[in-house]
């Protein structure tokens, strides 16, 4: 299965029977290389991925400045140290799951809820971890 298929079929999937077209997603290597992404995923700067990786290594690193992706600032909210970073901006937000080799991103806006985004992103991340990725 290609990485793009994981994005298209597992991250951009329908949630509870409704299209999640308000969700942007990507799978990005720890080095910032894009493995696959949805067409709506923002163009990001390498230093934004560096900051995200640093927060996984040192939880709380992004809390004072916020999480930035594609020039958009998200307020960092409760996550799982070293495993999941969550951010909020207005009625939407972001979930990032770290695997052994990649970062799985989900960006959402209403009507998608934080819990729905978390479930989709973390489920794929857990699967990739189980596969040694």
From Swiss-Prot:
GO terms for cellular component: cell cortex; cytoskeleton. It is found in: Cytoplasm, Cytoskeleton. A motif (Involved in PIP2 interaction) lies at residues 83-99. The variability of the residues taking part of IgE-binding epitopes might be responsible of the difference in cross-reactivity among olive pollen cultivars, and between distantly related pollen species, leading to a variable range of allergy reactions among atopic patients. The gene is BETVII. InterPro entries: PFN (IPR048278), PFN_euk (IPR005455), PFN_sf (IPR036140), Profilin_CS (IPR027310). Disulfide bonds join 13-117. The modification Phosphothreonine is found at residue 113. One of its GO terms (molecular function) is actin monomer binding. The keyword Cytoplasm applies. Keywords: Actin-binding, Allergen, Cytoplasm, Cytoskeleton, Disulfide bond, Phosphoprotein. Belongs to the profilin family. This is Profilin-1. Binds to actin and affects the structure of the cytoskeleton. At high concentrations, profilin prevents the polymerization of actin, whereas it enhances it at low concentrations. By binding to PIP2, it inhibits the formation of IP3 and DG. It comes from the Eukaryota. Occurs in many kinds of cells as a complex with monomeric actin in a 1:1 ratio. SUPFAM superfamilies: Profilin (actin-binding protein).
């Amino acid at each position: 299965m290609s990485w793009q298929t994981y994005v298209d079929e597992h991250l951009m999937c329908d949630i509870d029977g409704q299209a999640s077209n308000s969700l942007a997603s990507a799978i990005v290597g720890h080095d910032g290389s894009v493995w696959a992404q949805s067409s709506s995923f923002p163009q990001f700067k390498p230093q934004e991925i560096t900051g995200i990786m640093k927060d996984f290594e040192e939880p709380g690193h992004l809390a004072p400045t916020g999480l930035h992706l594609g020039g958009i600032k998200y307020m960092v909210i409760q996550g799982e140290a070293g495993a999941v970073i969550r951010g909020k901006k207005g009625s939407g937000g972001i979930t990032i799951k770290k695997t052994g080799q990649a970062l799985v991103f989900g960006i959402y806006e209403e009507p998608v809820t934080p819990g729905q985004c978390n479930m989709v992103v973390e489920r794929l991340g857990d699967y990739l971890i189980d596969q040694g990725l």
